[in-house]
Amino acid sequence: MNRSEFLKNISLATILLADGSIIPALGAESFARKNRLRFVVASDGHYGQAKTEFEQYFDTAVKQINAQHKQEKLDLCIFNGDVIHDNPDFLPASKKALDGLEMPYYVTQGNHDRVAPEIWEQTWKMALDYDVIVKDNVFLFGTTSNIKGEYLCPNVSWFRNKLEEHKDKKNVFIFVHITPVKWTENGIDCVEFQELVKQYKNVRGIFNGHDHDQESVKIKDKIPYLFDSHIGGSWGTAYRGFRVVELKKNNDVLTYLMNPIDKINEATI
């Protein structure tokens, strides 16, 4: 990438600040700050969907995420729901594809992941709701669906317990497939969840999949809600991409989308 292309890409970056505000990342200094943590969020692969090149979509995403890892280490990758498209027979093949990732990865259940809980947990060795701590940062993963593919709000009781357990941690990142705010056609209005998370000032961002046509950062109660486009499926943004998140040494969070080769829509939170 030449200097003009780099500066053009930088102008699209976003920085997420600890007070919930977002600002454009206007200069190279935003990228020059050292990272304390770096991860990728992807979603909506829809492995097995008819009349789509789902195997190619997964192959491209895995290769490009691994390329990011080679460029600068990724501590983890999150696949935020709709790994498969309805048919549980495709679950083993989708896992084999994601096993090509060269960093630890975690998954959440989406509405098209229509798999019995015991099969899901047996396949991924992960619960439907679970937490992980990476470099003293908390990651909370929650289901927003079930074997029927119903749209569900996150498990508020579970999240309340975990947010209270981790209230003294500096940063909490939350991952749920369906956006819990009704600001998109496919979102749902989870008022109890919204009221819960705003009580915890260490919640740095809530990451959503599901809405293939969404690529922005939205703010509610000073909490950023981040979308990541889609890596598969038959609709959505013209590109198939994923989100990169970089926690800086000063605790700013720089985030941008890869489409999946070029950097776009960067922000700091």
Please give the residue ranges for each predicted region.
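Conserved catalytic scaffold of divalent metal-dependent phosphoesterases
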Residues: 32, 47, 121-188, 257-260
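Active-site glycine-centered loops adjacent to acidic/histidine catalytic or metal-binding residues
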Residues: 44, 81-82, 110, 177, ...
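His/acidic metal-ligating clusters that form di-metal
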Residues: 67-76, 149-224
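Metal-dependent catalytic neighborhoods of phosphoester/phosphodiester hydrolases
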Residues: 80-99, 115-125, 184-187, 216-221
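N-terminal secretory signal peptides and thylakoid transit peptides that target proteins
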Residues: 1-17, 21
